[in-house]
Amino acid sequence: MLCGLSQIERFWHWAGARLLSAGGQMVSVLLLLVIQAGLLAYSATCHSPTHLEPAFLTAGICHWEFGRFELYRVNPPLPRMVAALPVWTLGCKTDWRRFTDAPGSRAEYAIGEDFLNANGPASIPLFIYARWACIPFSLLGGYFAYRWAGELYGKGAGLVTLFVWTFEPNLLAHAELMTPDCASWSFGILAEGMRGR
């Protein structure tokens, strides 16, 4: 031991100082966000669509194609519009025969089923593209959480917050989907962080 510090303690002191430096912070943030993007892209590719996703995707396509927002009107349209944009741009088969805007109707589920029937096995890559389009919502949420925690409690707290955001199982499970959960969390963090200024 030299001056009361072991080799390991000196290493951690050195590593912590480098990690909390401006350059170390930027590299750490980028690395964590790239890791999360990779985890989400992998999960979005290998997991089958949930029961809700066909309805979300067809509602988003309806928003782009017709400028109408009756389908899935119980949630804000931004996440499904982002998810549907690459699918709508690439082109897909749609069947709007069961569309209705009658009070209390939830036609998005029937139309989602028709979407699956019309596209068959070709619908799987479409869901993957739609999910990939929503990955930036989680990355933005992680970045905003890092910034907010860093402003409130210091650089170390910002990195710990981003680390938790990157690997938190519930977030990873929902951020791979095109549902509005992760987008809501991310914009909620942004709004709360902006409110505190």
Task: Kindly give the residue locations of the regions a language model identified.
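Membrane-interfacial, low-structure loops and terminal tails that flank and connect transmembrane helices
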Residues: 1-23
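Transmembrane-helix signature of polytopic, membrane-embedded enzymes
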Residues: 25-28, 97-113, 145-167
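Alpha-helical transmembrane segments of multi-pass integral membrane proteins
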Residues: 29-32, 130-134, 161, 180
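Short helix- or helix-capping micro-motifs
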Residues: 32-33, 161-166, 173, 193
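Helix-to-loop transition at the C-terminal end of transmembrane segments
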Residues: 38-55, 69, 91-98
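Short acidic/glycine- and proline-prone juxtamembrane loop motifs at membrane-interface regions
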Residues: 51, 176-183
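Interfacial juxtamembrane loops and adjacent helix segments
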Residues: 70-133
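Transmembrane-helix motifs of polytopic, lipid-linked glycan transferases
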Residues: 132-152, 187-194
